[in-house]
Amino acid sequence: MTNNYVRFWGVRGSYPAPFKTHMVYGGNTPCVEIRLGKELVIFDAGTGIIPLGNQLMAQDEIRHVHIVLSHYHWDHIQGLPYFVPAFVPGWKINIYGPAESPGGLAHQIAQQMKAPYFPVEVETWLADISYHTPGAKPFDAGAAKLQAFPVHHPGITFGYRLEFGGKTVVYAPDNELQFINQSIDDRKAEFDDEEKALLEAMKEEQHLKGIAFMANADMVIHDAQYTPADYKRKRGWGHSCYIDTIDSAIDAGADSLCLFSHDPNYNDVTLDEIAALADAQVESRETDLACYLAREDMTISFDSDRMLPE
């Protein structure tokens, strides 16, 4: 297998789903490994980071990792207190994420390991830990260049655009793509024809702005938590319907799309049905976008012409 790849360790949103009916796609919360030779970028620290940490300890090949957090909702950080390398001397761990409190990123991480929520605090970490808050400019994480961008989700939340070896991977696990446009549609009846034309222009402008971060990406890993029916009931919760995610990736000129952050209530049968419906949506748009659902242990090479599951 290539030494430059994307591997999924956790693909669920909201909370872990360790159920027999969910094992084909997996039940861990978000964690995506970006292996770049002897360097490692980890997107988010949901429960999927726990088995990843155990594997890193067993392999003993890498001692320097970059953990890149989208935000601090439980499902994106709940595995970090169990990431074994953090407790081992000789490891260097760079942690990146938005600054949502006066104490910054370090404060956000420390809070979840304080009593009465956890038996030991971050002071028990023996690795060399450093904290970084991305700004408007791109930053380097080992051999990769990353750019943070804000997304539509409760609280301060980032997505990331990663470039390596001539390929671009976009990671946006929690992002409601069509909230503003759907809200405009709800109130169209209140306006006359001239105002409706202005609203349509606003919608198009908002749509283009909302998909700019995934423009021409080789691979987009994006929130697709809901079916259309569930999205109607949960609009404003900060997650996307898979239809909106597919349409946005196509409009942005992305080459491949990985539907991510599966609802923990969706079992394997439901996700198989969504996969078939997603294929139909891509076909209806008459595009060659490669679209697939994230699964735990799914691996995608940077070194292939197209970034597709192996």
Question: Which residue ranges define each predicted feature?
Answer:
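Conserved beta-strand hairpin/beta-sheet module of binuclear metal-dependent hydrolase folds
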Residues: 2-60, 158-178
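Metallo-beta-lactamase
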Residues: 3, 93, 98-156, 165
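Extended recognition/assembly regions associated with phosphoester-bond processing machinery
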Residues: 4-5, 61, 147, 292, ...
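Metal-dependent phosphodiesterase/nuclease catalytic metal-binding core
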Residues: 31-35, 130-260, 271-276, 284, ...
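Active-site neighborhood of phospho(di)ester-bond hydrolases with catalytic His/Asp-centered motifs
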Residues: 42-46, 65-73, 97, 170-173, ...
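Active-site metal-binding motif and surrounding structural segment of the metallo-beta-lactamase
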Residues: 47-96
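A short helix->loop->beta-strand "cap" motif at the edges of active sites that frequently abuts
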Residues: 90-93, 252-257, 287-289
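Short acidic, glycine/proline-enriched helix-loop-strand junctions
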Residues: 266-297
